[in-house]
C-alpha cells in the first residue's frame, strides 16, 4: 500500500537578528532560504524512513521549483504528480529575534487550482494502491 501526501510547497525565507531586534530600525543578522511547506516536509520525512511516498502538489515553473522537485527525488519521493505552474509555491518570510522567537512574518499562499486539476485528472490512478 502506498502513502500519498497532498499539499503545498513553500519557500521559507528566515532572517535571524544577531542582537536585540529593533522593529523600526536596521538589524544585522543572517538570512537563509529553505524548502518548506507542511506537506512537502511530511513527504520528505516519510521518504527519510524509506517509505517512498507519492507527493501531489504544485511548484513554480522556474529554477526554484525544479530545485524542489530534484531534492524530493533525491529523497526517493515520487514526484510525477507535481505540476509546474506560475504561483505554484507559497512563500513564508519570517524574522526572528536574537533569542530565536518570531517577531514578524508574512505569508503568500500558492494557487491551489493545480492540485485540484491533478486530483481530477489522476485521482483514480493515484489512490488505487494507496
Which ranges hold each PLM region?
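Conserved N-terminal subdomain of the carbohydrate kinase-like
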Residues: 24-26, 48-130
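Glycine-rich phosphate/adenosyl-contacting loop at the front of the ribokinase-like
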Residues: 1-56, 63-67
Amino acid at each position: 500500500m502506498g502513502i500519498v501526501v497532498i499539499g503545498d510547497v513553500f519557500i521559507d525565507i528566515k532572517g535571524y537578528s544577531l542582537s536585540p531586534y529593533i522593529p523600526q530600525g536596521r538589524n544585522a543578522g543572517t538570512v537563509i532560504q529553505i524548502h518548506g511547506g507542511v506537506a512537502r516536509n511530511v513527504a520528505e520525512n516519510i521518504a527519510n524512513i524509506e517509505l517512498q511516498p507519492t507527493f501531489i502538489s504544485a511548484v513554480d515553473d522556474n529554477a526554484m521549483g525544479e530545485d524542489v522537485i530534484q531534492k524530493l527525488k533525491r529523497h526517493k519521493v515520487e514526484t510525477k504528480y507535481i505540476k509546474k505552474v506560475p504561483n505554484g509555491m507559497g512563500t513564508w518570510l519570517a524574522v526572528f529575534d536574537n533569542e530565536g522567537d518570531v517577531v514578524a512574518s508574512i505569508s503568500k499562499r500558492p494557487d491551489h487550482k493545480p492540485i485540484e486539476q491533478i486530483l481530477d485528472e489522476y485521482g483514480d490512478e493515484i489512490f488505487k494502491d494507496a
